């Protein structure tokens, strides 16, 4: 993964010029590009003592960063815990088995409280109706819950997932915040700003149920 802003921009520029025969006006559709800015990026890349931002003559922030957006979003590790319980019983005529599982994993992001939770219940019963007739029924339930950050940017009427916007708007050359503490466009468009502030996310819930019934007839009894 390329996290050096100059290397990333140079590769993008070469690809764009080879494809279209001219310089781009933007990197993708948001981040402004010009040769003047690119030359300044090269100068600041060669001397780490320079700031990774400046205010241009239009009083607009320009960025010259080396941001690893995956480090911004994701934790290095996470933890989880699982609990299981089962009950079984019965006799010659009928028997049963019931099990339950609860799994919870801490969030993978550096912001928000998006723990993943999953609950499973399985129940199985067997009834020997006759020596030659057996009926079995098995039912499974599974419930999953996970909140996820999203990006509401105006680019699409549908909120975009973080993974999509990281590919689209997380330029290494961009910074996360401005010197005055405000969010950069990249932080807003990737969804990071909204997720940190708690106003841009979705809750994914899914419930599954399966039921299976089997009848066994032994014609030899």
Give, region by region, the residue ranges found by the protein language model:
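Surface-exposed loop/interface segments of Gram-negative outer-membrane beta-barrel transport/assembly proteins
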Residues: 1-66, 103, 107-210
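Aromatic side chains
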Residues: 96-97, 119
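Outer-membrane beta-barrel transmembrane strands
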Residues: 75-95, 101, 193-221
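C-terminal beta-signal and adjacent terminal beta-strands/loops
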Residues: 2-3, 72-74
């Amino acid at each position: 993964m390329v996290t050096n802003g100059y290397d990333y921009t140079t590769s993008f520029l070469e690809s764009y010029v080879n494809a279209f025969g001219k310089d781009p006006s933007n990197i993708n559709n948001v981040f402004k590009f010009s040769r003047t800015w690119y030359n300044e990026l090269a100068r600041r890349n060669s001397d780490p003592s320079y700031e990774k931002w400046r205010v241009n003559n239009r009083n607009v922030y320009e960025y010259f960063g080396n941001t690893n957006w995956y480090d911004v979003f994701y934790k290095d590790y996470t933890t989880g815990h699982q609990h299981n319980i089962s009950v079984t019983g019965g006799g010659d005529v009928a028997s049963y088995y019931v099990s339950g599982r609860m799994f919870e994993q801490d969030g993978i992001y550096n912001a928000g409280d998006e723990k993943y939770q999953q609950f499973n219940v399985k129940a199985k019963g067997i009834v020997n109706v006759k020596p030659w007739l057996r009926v079995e029924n098995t039912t499974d339930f599974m419930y999953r819950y996970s909140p996820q950050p999203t990006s509401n940017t105006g680019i699409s009427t549908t909120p975009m997932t973080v993974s999509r916007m990281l590919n689209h708007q997380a330029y290494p050359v961009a910074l996360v915040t401005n010197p005055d503490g405000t969010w950069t466009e990249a932080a807003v468009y990737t969804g990071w700003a909204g997720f940190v502030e708690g106003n841009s996310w979705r809750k994914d819930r899914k419930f599954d149920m399966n039921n299976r019934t089997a009848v066994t007839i032994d014609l030899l009894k």
